[in-house]
Amino acid sequence: MKKKQNRVAVSVFMIIGLVLLRGSASAGDQPVLMMATTTSTDDTGLLDYLEPHFKKATGIELRWTATGTGKALALGRNCDVDLLLVHDPEAEIQFVQAGHGVNRHPIMYNDFILIGPPADPAGIKGQSAAGGLAAIAGRRALFVSRGDQSGTHLKELQLWRAATPNQPEKEAWYVQTGQGMLSTIHVAAERSGYTLTDRGTYIKYENTQGGKPPLVVLVEGDERLRNQYSTIEVSTTRCKKVNADAARKFSAWMAGPQARKLIGDFKLLGKQLFIPNAEVR
């Protein structure tokens, strides 16, 4: 039976949960793959959708914990998982270069978007990402950040650096939730603020609101907003007990024709959440 962990900070409780899952995995007859992934692949329902197809194709049971990319990479460094599915290319490359992971493969992408109230009090609609954030800062309009070192949060900080020399973390109008993307969107909606989200999670949120969300897309299409997801196998040199075979099979399956079609067909409200772009291996 597939198990996924609650989206919480890396803590004693998360590590204990992963140890227990790994122990139960070794107790059964079928192979189990332990994966750490970003919240967006979980919040959107993508992994629930893919998991039974992967198990049928390979006989491997997929179990995952969903957290921010920074914390997912930490789980990989600590040898608590076999594989990562994450979306911060710069941090991923550093992870591999440091010897913690091997075989980083792009799998799919979508984009980041700036969303906010339809009235758009900061006047950001149609601007570039940097221009939109500069306008938010200039108007001191409420901005809600994940503040959790996730891939989305790190992208947001990168965009702020391009937008203004004065970083917003200590400003009263800048709120950090320390939570996942869906929860952060809900906080922004409750307070009529702006936030940065990946498009897939926004479509999921839009779906939960019956197609009429209180926050709308205001900034999109900037080339800086591309959001690439990749798999990384945890290094067996650093982590002797990882299930390297299962990790390789999942990575290869995600790049193959079946998963590419499934990812491309995965839609809510008739909208595609992720675009497959893996090179078939």
Predicted regions and their residues:
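Bacterial N-terminal signal peptides that target proteins for export
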Residues: 2-12
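Bacterial N-terminal signal peptides
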Residues: 11-22
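Exported/periplasmic ABC-transporter solute-binding proteins
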Residues: 28-61, 65, 70, 74-80, ...
